[in-house]
Amino acid sequence: MPPLGAALGGSEDVRDVVHHVLALAGRTHDGLRAQRGMAKFATACVACHGADGKGNQQIGAANLTDDIWLHGGTEAAITESIVKGRINQMPAHKDFLDEGKIHLLTAYVLGISGQGKP
């Protein structure tokens, strides 16, 4: 995600968008700010995250409506993501991990996440 703070306007505009993102996620937010942030979100964020905030997974755009917050789901963390941007796509590992190692790694990650079996 590129830095979008300047594209949104000033810090108050960014804060409005942050509250719209919090609203999409069903988190505590300021309703007035979220309403104002909706228009800015539609201008700067919809192309990647979609109008519903579900994100385009094929390009690495996060789903803003779930409980998975790679860089934090607080107002401060979301603000930082918008202002500074994020580069967080994981490179492909198929060229140096065979199928067996991929399954083992998958099982390990699921195990430490508490999600159960693959």
Regions found by a protein language model. Give the residues of each.
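Extracytoplasmic electron-transfer domains, predominantly the class I c-type cytochrome c fold
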Residues: 1-24, 56-114
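Sequence/structural segment immediately N-terminal to covalent heme-attachment motifs in c-type
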Residues: 29-55, 66, 79-84, 117-118
